[in-house]
Amino acid sequence: ILEVTANRPTDVAMATRSLQGRADVIYTSLDNNVISAFEAMASAANEMKIPVITSDEFSVRRGATAALGVNDYDFGRVTGKMVYRVLNGDAITDIKPEVMNKLTLYVSPKHAKQQGVTLDSSVIADGINVDETKPSNEAS
């Protein structure tokens, strides 16, 4: 496991390129600098043929190969139920925190190919193919 730091969004592409020959895959979470320059990171990963794995649907839509993370729609529904309770008089201290245990797999065969990998058909079947679906925050 290697850690690469990008102190500013303008450092993201260079930090990504520093992994050439040293990493088989890139994982990133929702870091503000990376999110601000995600396309630059994905472009560098494409050039080096290193797949990018992340934790959210929208990064897959922006260039990652895959993500395993919380579905924003489901997260919003849970949050909405908590807000409903508060608005109906429940004390915030009476509402227990909830952990989102249900994770969703998001995949992009198109981005995988650009990053030098082919996703197995079973992986594509088990996930949500963002190349063929609307974002979870858009109405159907």
Feature-to-residue mapping (PLM):
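Short hydrophobic alpha-helices and adjacent helix-cap/hinge residues
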Residues: 1-140
